[in-house]
A protein has these predicted regions:
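Bacterial N-terminal signal peptides
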Residues: 4-14
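N-terminus-centered regions that define maturation/targeting leaders and the start
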Residues: 15-136
Length: 136
């Protein structure tokens, strides 16, 4: 029981430190593809972020398996670029899709951060990754 209380306290603290985007904040356009991404690779795909607001210093990126509440695939933070392009392989804590039997839907979540780490905007894109042996 004590362990459950400790885990609950840790999760509450983690949620409290996650900065929220201001109400009415702009939405980012997020674009990526699984093309040329080998299965079970830790090399992140190229990501294009559009409509980043003025003052954006960094992008925080996370890949999430939307079919499993506990399956997060990491990501990382990278410096914002004028064109909003995050090059392939730029996310150092990324674990790519590795579905065993069936296609899985993933969501790429991107936050635009200012220099102090405040969230200015958010955006997502969902794509399904099909295991190589099931592709036609």
């Amino acid at each position: 029981m004590r362990a459950v209380a400790l885990v609950a306290a840790f999760l509450a603290a983690a949620c409290a430190t996650q900065p929220a985007a201001p109400r009415g904040a702009p939405e980012l356009g997020v674009e990526f593809t699984w093309k040329d991404v080998p299965p079970c690779s830790n090399v992140s795909p190229r990501i294009i972020v559009r409509d980043a607001p003025a003052g954006t210093a960094r992008f925080r990126v996370e890949l999430v398996d939307v079919d499993s509440a506990i399956s997060r695939h990491g990501g990382g933070e990278v410096a914002a670029t004028p064109g909003g392009v995050i090059p392939a392989g730029a996310l150092k804590s990324y674990r790519g899709p590795c579905p065993a039997q069936q296609p899985i839907t993933y969501e790429m979540r991107v936050q635009a951060l200012d220099a102090s780490g405040r969230v200015l905007a958010r955006g997502t894109e969902r794509l399904t990754y099909t295991p190589v042996r099931l592709r036609r």
